[in-house]
């Protein structure tokens, strides 16, 4: 499922500038179609997790690493 950028901004309560910054850093990858930008549900859930970690004081790189970590590693089964 894909969401227009406006919907992603509203759901995650972030600014257009923040979304552009995340895109420039490779956190999310919008798809342009018919003059609009769309993001996948994976992008939305991934960015939501990153924002939660950042709200707890983690820098972007660490938040990103934790969100992208495989489930087994998180549960201590490495």
Regions found by a protein language model. Give the residues of each.
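Arg/Lys-rich, alpha-helical DNA-contact motif
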Residues: 1-11, 20, 24-36, 41-78
């Amino acid at each position: 499922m894909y969401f227009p950028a406006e919907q992603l901004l509203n759901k995650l309560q972030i600014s257009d500038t923040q979304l552009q910054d995340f895109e420039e850093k490779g956190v999310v990858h919008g798809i342009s179609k018919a003059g609009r930008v769309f993001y996948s549900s994976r992008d939305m859930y991934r960015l939501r997790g990153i924002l939660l970690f950042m709200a707890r004081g983690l820098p972007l790189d660490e938040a990103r690493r934790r969100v992208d970590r495989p489930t087994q590693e998180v549960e201590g089964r490495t």
